[in-house]
């Protein structure tokens, strides 16, 4: 997956580089060049959250992360009950308060932590985090 710096479109990086670097030049965010359409969406909808997440990430990242490694990263990031109650027929909502911290960050931050753990070279790394205000 190639991503570009939204402030400098010619700056391209891989997913791995974007995770490790965080921000691009001039504090630009990284964004994918394009999203390829998912095939077999109906089949994906039959899967539970974690296997579905693995399939979607595999589609987005291609071979940038080995499939067994990606599967392990996703399964370890979401090792808690993921609830998606039906709101109306055919419409579900992802409840973001079932993780270890009982906050939405369990979905984004835990996977990001797995990515950082997998991608870094073992040298020193500083990770700065903050609360959103409602949990800290």
Regions found by a protein language model. Give the residues of each.
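PLP-dependent amino-acid enzyme catalytic core
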Residues: 1-136
């Amino acid at each position: 997956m190639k991503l570009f710096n939204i402030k400098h479109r010619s700056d391209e990086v891989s997913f791995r580089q974007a995770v490790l670097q965080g921000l691009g030049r001039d504090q630009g965010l990284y964004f994918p060049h394009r999203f390829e359409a998912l095939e077999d969406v109906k089949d994906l909808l039959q899967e539970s959250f974690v296997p579905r997440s693995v399939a979607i990430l595999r589609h987005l990242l291609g071979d940038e992360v080995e499939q067994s490694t990606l599967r392990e990263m996703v399964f370890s990031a979401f090792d808690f009950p993921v609830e998606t109650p039906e709101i109306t027929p055919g419409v579900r909502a992802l409840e973001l308060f079932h993780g270890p911290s009982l906050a939405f960050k369990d979905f984004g931050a835990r996977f990001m932590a797995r990515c950082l753990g997998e991608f870094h070279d073992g040298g020193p790394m500083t990770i700065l985090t903050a609360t959103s205000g409602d949990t800290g």
